[in-house]
């Protein structure tokens, strides 16, 4: 899919400058997104014809499961209506939205279970399935998934004392920072030590247009 790469040089700068980005990065990202928009025929942050993005690590050496990923980035309560009109499938759209809020809340905002605590998002999901008498996530209706989006945002606000970001650009920078930060996560550091991967390499960040694996039973995605 169409996309662009934020290089390891930016990662190095990020750590050398107290997790701040180079001044020129904002303009570079804006120009790169415009190229993706041209290719995909959609616009990032546009409620009428939204472009959603994936944000993944691009480390020089493969580090499976060690680095963070954010999918379906670029959604908010206004843009979801445009995605529904564009796709004609409300259930798919709210499934995408609840997955995004859950992943962003975990990976970027840091809402994770403490100790033996049950994951707060999974707890709400299980409650919703029980309430509607279903066993599988894909059996939940569009209405139930829409409710989950609101409940996920509410638990983020309650636990973290801050709101889920509605601005797609803010979401993007948060996700890029989360990928950079995962390079210095405990698991990633231990993995590099075991595999002999230099710590100073840093990671790039790959930003791509979304490819969906949840549009139906005949739909899937994978990483090679």
Regions found by a protein language model. Give the residues of each.
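Nucleotide/phosphate-binding sheet-loop regions of phosphoryl- and nucleotidyl-transfer enzymes
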Residues: 1-224
């Amino acid at each position: 899919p169409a996309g662009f790469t934020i290089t390891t040089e930016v990662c190095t700068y990020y750590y050398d400058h107290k997790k701040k980005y180079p001044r020129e990065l904002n303009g570079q990202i804006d120009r790169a997104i415009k190229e993706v928009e041209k290719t995909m025929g959609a616009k990032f942050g546009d409620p009428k014809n939204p472009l959603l993005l994936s944000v993944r690590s691009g480390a020089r050496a493969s580090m499976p499961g060690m680095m963070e990923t954010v999918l379906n980035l670029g959604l908010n309560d206004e843009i979801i209506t445009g995605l529904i009109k564009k796709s004609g499938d409300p259930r798919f759209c709210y499934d995408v939205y609840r997955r995004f809020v859950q992943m962003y809340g975990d990976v970027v905002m840091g809402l994770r279970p403490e100790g033996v605590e049950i994951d707060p998002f999974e707890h709400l999901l299980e409650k919703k399935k029980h309430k509607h008498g279903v066993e599988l996530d894909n059996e939940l209706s569009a209405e139930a998934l829409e409710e989950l989006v609101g409940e996920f945002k509410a638990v983020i606000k309650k636990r973290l004392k801050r709101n889920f970001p509605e601005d797609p650009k803010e979401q993007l920078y948060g996700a890029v920072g989360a990928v950079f930060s995962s390079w210095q996560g405990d698991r990633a550091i231990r993995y590099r030590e075991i595999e002999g991967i230099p710590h100073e390499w840093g990671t790039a960040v790959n930003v791509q247009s979304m490819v969906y694996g949840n549009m139906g039973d005949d739909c899937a995605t994978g990483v090679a």
